[in-house]
Amino acid sequence: MAEKTYPMTLEEKEKLEKELEELKLVRRPEIVERIKIARSYGDLSENSEYEAAKDEQAFVEGQISTIETKIRYAEIVNSDAVAADEVAIGKTVTVQEVGETEEEVYHIVGAAGADVFANKISNESPIGHALIGKKTGDVATIETPAGSYDVKILKVEKTK
């Protein structure tokens, strides 16, 4: 069975590599040291410092594993390979909900680069999924748990 690929820009992959390095070279050794210190307190059955450090260790190891998988199966997307006015990972899209006047600007990224506070939406999100492959002037239907709505694509450009 083929592994799932993770579409992302080169910048997103580099960001993941830096995060992985931070986890392996900084966080992991810090946690190991905390576990060592907590063990020195004696009885582990009622040692909250030890339990907290072990929980954090499990969390960090899970993050490391997830990031390693995403990097291993990264599919680097070149937004230059699609038409200039076509929505793809690495593009910035300006849309307007049909019947409304306010415009929204989204940066389409792979799941690893999503950041709603910076308007970076994943290609796997309801909005990203509906917009991928559409072109300037197209209308896309966004399906969300709260219902659906239509947006018109006003502008597509390469993310700077």
Swiss-Prot record:
Task: Give the transmembrane ranges.
Answer: none
**UniProt cross-references to Pfam families, sorted A to Z:** GreA_GreB, GreA_GreB_N
Q: Which domain of life is it from?
A: Bacteria
Protein's GO biological process: DNA-templated transcription elongation; regulation of DNA-templated transcription elongation
Q: Does the keyword Coiled coil apply?
A: yes
**Per its record, what are the GO molecular function terms?**
DNA binding; RNA polymerase binding
PROSITE patterns associated with the record: GREAB_1, GREAB_2
Family as reported in the entry's similarity comment: Belongs to the GreA/GreB family.
**Main role?**
Necessary for efficient RNA polymerase transcription elongation past template-encoded arresting sites. The arresting sites in DNA have the property of trapping a certain fraction of elongating RNA polymerases that pass through, resulting in locked ternary complexes. Cleavage of the nascent transcript by cleavage factors such as GreA or GreB allows the resumption of elongation from the new 3'terminus. GreA releases sequences of 2 to 3 nucleotides.
Listed PANTHER family: TRANSCRIPTION ELONGATION FACTOR GREA (PTHR30437:SF4)
The protein's name in its UniProt record: Transcription elongation factor GreA
Species of origin: Streptococcus suis (strain 05ZYH33)
